[in-house]
Amino acid sequence: AQPDQKLTLEFAALRLINVEDMGVSPGGAGAATSGSDVRGVGLVGSIESHLGNATKVKDKKALRNIGPSVTYRLRDASGQAREFQNYMVPVELDGQRVFLAGLRDTPAEPFHYLRIPADESDRIDGWLRLRQALVDPALREKAVMRYATAATPADRPEMAEQLQLTTRRAIGLFAGVEATGLNSQPGPAGLQALGEFVEKNVPAEDRERISQVLLRILNGSLFELLNLSREQAGLARLPLGATTEAFMTQAVLSLSDSFLYPAPVLFELADFKHVQASVFQVAHAQGKTLVYLSAVVLIIGVFQS
């Protein structure tokens, strides 16, 4: 959807209980792949490995209620609608807590899910700040300079300028503002854009090595961008460590997937009030005394038999 496209919001359903099979088959074909190290992600690989079903078929079932969800439709001016299903609380997949934002084009299709990592407060806010910072040219440039300064070896200061250029190109490709070839216009974004750039500009024998270098640079610059967004929100920098690395790995994957998300907005179920009502029908029955008396006689007869 285009940002200026007029869409109509249609509420479809609120489900309080969603029981899903959360079983894990280690190393099996059904295991979720979104928690893998981004440095090992094939740049030309299919997006389906990340933007997929919330749960896959696994060898061992583990049914679990993963909380409330809201379903809604966004309908365009031509009457075409897409259906979305967003969960209220994060779900743990492969040891990573993620928010599931589902979508499908028709009711006959299964939902496919964008997996957004939860921040240290178990909220979606950290990822949203990073997503907004990614489309801000000024913040991207600050992140480039910070990363290049930190990554330049102290004994090789002459590398600083080249590292700045490479970092600027990597994060620009990821943000969709850099062309992937000499004679092309900016087009794809995310990991797909880096993949196209490598295919068009790097000899086949060097592609794997260059891909790894670009991904390390991208990860580092996005980490600086994340901390810049936290500074703007009055938050401290995220410390380096396994938890931060896991968040950044999933953040990079979901940022890449988000460029394929077909809507300019994502609605979050923040709170709701569940009101249950029971209705009892009270009717006046003729001859009720006779009915009650017959019931008493019947009960006495049962105990005396």
Where are these regions (language model features)?
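Solvent-exposed, non-transmembrane regions of integral membrane proteins
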Residues: 1-305
